[in-house]
Amino acid sequence: MSNWLVDKLIPSIMRSEVKKSSVPEGLWHKCPSCDAVLYRPELEKTLDVCPKCNHHMRIGARARLNIFLDVDGREELGVDLEPVDRLKFRDGKKYKDRLTAAQKQTGEKDALISMSGTLLGMPVVASAFEFSFMGGSMGAIVGERFVRAANYALENRCPMICFAASGGARMQEALISLMQMAKTSAVLARLREEGLPFISVLTDPVYGGVSASLAMLGDVIVAEPKALIGFAGPRVIEQTVREKLPEGFQRSEFLLDHGAIDMIIARSELRPRLGNLLAQMMNLPTPRFVAPVIEPIIVPPAPATI
């Protein structure tokens, strides 16, 4: 073996491997919209909104509730509920196995989390869909957790907010999942009868049985920028009508222009704007919002590839 190979090439390869392994996994994230390579700690400060192009990335249900509700006084509702494979459903894989895999991947028992707490000091109850759990699909547990949150609002005379992110009803639960559309719609009718506000916040994406029920039944319907919202997907519609759809079809901006939703609010503005709106709807004093101080972050040079 030559001296050059021993003295130069092998140490160079070893240094390269050490350098690669010293970069923690998940430290960098590529924006799916503009391909900018973003430093994860910086992205957390912007609530997972790309600082380069303002793309609102998908975030988990628990993270969403944590950034929306006040820190103190949160309590999760329906935490004891777990899904059951009553139909012994199987497609390419057993439903029971799909549930186990989704629970392991997300750390959640099902695709909806509900919490009571406060928003700028005002008592509220909030629910959020976990899209990473089987596409945020709505089954019996999702429906029951939503109903328990609504019942909490009824018992405590407080408003309810839901952050929807779902592909629709859960196929593996068949009619049981479709029944949740009626079940959730019925409890929202009770909220309306009692004069308690329900605000629906549509995030990317909202489709199927969720968009056809609870997601579009808000007293005020809000969406994040550029969220995909519809019943069937745009490709399915194009194949059905055999026509090219308008640019931006099913994006939140398109729906706002056509009167299907009430407003679009950036993620960073949801707390103050919804807090102010709910205070007006509940005839309460305007809450005081203090924007968090964002400490500057020193961003190291981005890697060439991630």
From Swiss-Prot:
Q: Residue ranges of the CoA carboxyltransferase N-terminal domain?
A: 27-296
> What the protein does?
Component of the acetyl coenzyme A carboxylase (ACC) complex. Biotin carboxylase (BC) catalyzes the carboxylation of biotin on its carrier protein (BCCP) and then the CO(2) group is transferred by the transcarboxylase to acetyl-CoA to form malonyl-CoA.
| Location, primary (coarse class) | cytoplasm
* Cofactor(s) the record lists: Zn(2+)
Could you say which EC number(s) this protein's record lists?
2.1.3.15
Q: State the name under which the record lists this protein.
A: Acetyl-coenzyme A carboxylase carboxyl transferase subunit beta
The reply on keyword Transcription is: no
Q: Which gene encodes it?
A: accD
The family database entries (Gene3D superfamilies) matched by this protein are listed as: 2-enoyl-CoA Hydratase, Chain A, domain 1
Report the locations given in the UniProt record. Cytoplasm
- What pathway annotation does it carry? Lipid metabolism; malonyl-CoA biosynthesis; malonyl-CoA from acetyl-CoA: step 1/1
Write out the entry's keywords from A to Z.
ATP-binding, Cytoplasm, Fatty acid biosynthesis, Fatty acid metabolism, Lipid biosynthesis, Lipid metabolism, Metal-binding, Nucleotide-binding, Transferase, Zinc, Zinc-finger
Please name the source species: Pseudomonas syringae pv. tomato (strain ATCC BAA-871 / DC3000)
One of its Pfam families is Carboxyl_trans
Q: Report the superkingdom from the record.
A: Bacteria
**GO molecular-function term, one example from the UniProt record:** ATP binding
Q: Which residues bind Zn(2+)?
A: 31, 34, 50, 53
